[in-house]
C-alpha cells in the first residue's frame, strides 16, 4: 500500500518525475553507508528497479528448470545469492522450486530476491543466444551494451552465467543516469 501511494505521488506531479526521484535515491545511496545498505528496499528506488513480482520469478524458475535443469544443478548458487547479500534486498524462499537443485537443509540457501531470479533467467537467455549465434565469436570475446542498468545486477548475473558457459565477454558497457552509474563503482 505504501509503495502504491508513493507511485501515485510521483506520477501525480507535473509530468513523470520518477527519474528525478530515482536519481536522488542513487545520489543519497552514494553519500551514506546506511542508505547504501538498504537502497534495494527504498520505495523510491524500487519504483524503477528491484520490483519483480514473486510470481514472475516463479515462472522464470519454471522456464529455467524446463530448459536448463542440468546447468542449474551445477551452477554455484552462492555466487547467485551474492546479488542479494552485498546489500539488503527483499528476499523470498524459493525452496519449493529449488529443493531438488540446491542440496541444503538451511532455509537461507533458498532465499533470493525475485529480481535476482529474473536476472538469472535473463542471463541464461542472453548467453544462450550468444552461444547459438553464428555471428558472435564467443572465444575471442563479445561485447554487450546494457541501457538502464541501475546498480549492475544484470551485468553481474550475465558475467556469472557467461563464466559458467565459458563465454568470453570482452566488454560490457553500462549506460544509465549519472548517479546510477556511480552505484556500479
Regions found by a protein language model. Name each.
Residues 171-177:
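Conserved SAM-binding motif I beta-strand of class I
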Residues 185:
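S-adenosyl-L-methionine
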Residues 140-150:
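Conserved class I S-adenosyl-L-methionine
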Residues 14-16, 21-135:
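Conserved Class I S-adenosyl-L-methionine-dependent methyltransferase catalytic core
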Residues 152-166:
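Conserved SAM-binding loop of SAM-dependent methyltransferases across substrates and taxa
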Residues 122, 141, 158:
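P-loop NTPase catalytic core of nucleic-acid-dependent motor ATPases
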Residues 1-5:
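Intrinsically disordered, low-structural-confidence terminal and linker regions
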Residues 181-182:
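Short alpha-helix immediately C-terminal to the canonical SAM-binding loop
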